Amino acid sequence: MAELGEADEAELQRLVAAEQQKAQFTAQVHHFMELCWDKCVEKPGSRLDSRTENCLSSCVDRFIDTTLAITGRFAQIVQKGGQ
């Protein structure tokens, strides 16, 4: 197998990092849904009632908003540190 050039290696690292981010995001969503399920679903049935659907939606939205706010703030701190 031929050795990778610097550009190929950088591209490979970028692709691996992107896949890791996707996997981390998916894991977070599953974790949020598990927490929200425990909080919102009293007794599972064949269908979710509107109250439960609203609770689940609001719960996940809160987690996502919080995560985005923390991530944005962290990025600002890192950017200021790099200047």
Curated annotation (Swiss-Prot):
GO terms for cellular component: mitochondrial inner membrane; mitochondrion. The keyword Transmembrane helix does not apply. Disulfide bonds join 36-59, 40-55. It comes from the Eukaryota. Pfam families: zf-Tim10_DDP. The modification N-acetylalanine is found at residue 2. GO terms for molecular function: metal ion binding. GO terms for biological process: protein transport. Heterohexamer; possibly composed of 3 copies of TIMM8B and 3 copies of TIMM13, named soluble 70 kDa complex. Associates with the TIM22 complex, whose core is composed of TIMM22. Probable mitochondrial intermembrane chaperone that participates in the import and insertion of some multi-pass transmembrane proteins into the mitochondrial inner membrane. Also required for the transfer of beta-barrel precursors from the TOM complex to the sorting and assembly machinery (SAM complex) of the outer membrane. Acts as a chaperone-like protein that protects the hydrophobic precursors from aggregation and guide them through the mitochondrial intermembrane space. This is Mitochondrial import inner membrane translocase subunit Tim8 B. It comes from Mus musculus (Mouse). The lineage of its organism: Eukaryota, Metazoa, Chordata, Craniata, Vertebrata. The gene is Timm8b.
